């Protein structure tokens, strides 16, 4: 119970108020992460997503370009 009371008193004593600002300040590991590293990680995510979509799109086009015979199989 003491833990809640100390965080409550810390919040009350700071200049933040209102519902929007009801979250305490987060300053722990935020300084350890650089913007450059985050941008690099985001770039890798974007590239992996684009490559995956391109492969799916290509296989869909190949499947749709092969005509089906009357028995339901594709001709090669």
Swiss-Prot record:
Residue ranges, annotated region (Disordered): 1-25, 48-76
Keyword Iron-sulfur set for record: no
Composition bias, Polar residues: 1-10, 64-76
Domain of life of the organism encoding this protein: Eukaryota
rRNA-binding in keyword set: no
Alphabetical list of Pfam families matching this protein: PKI
The protein's name: cAMP-dependent protein kinase inhibitor gamma
Molecular function (Gene Ontology), one example: cAMP-dependent protein kinase inhibitor activity
Main function: Extremely potent competitive inhibitor of cAMP-dependent protein kinase activity, this protein interacts with the catalytic subunit of the enzyme after the cAMP-induced dissociation of its regulatory chains.
UniProt KW keywords: Protein kinase inhibitor
Family per similarity comment: Belongs to the PKI family.
Spans through the membrane: none
GO terms for cellular component: cytoplasm; nucleus
InterPro entries the UniProt entry points to: cAMP_dep_PKI
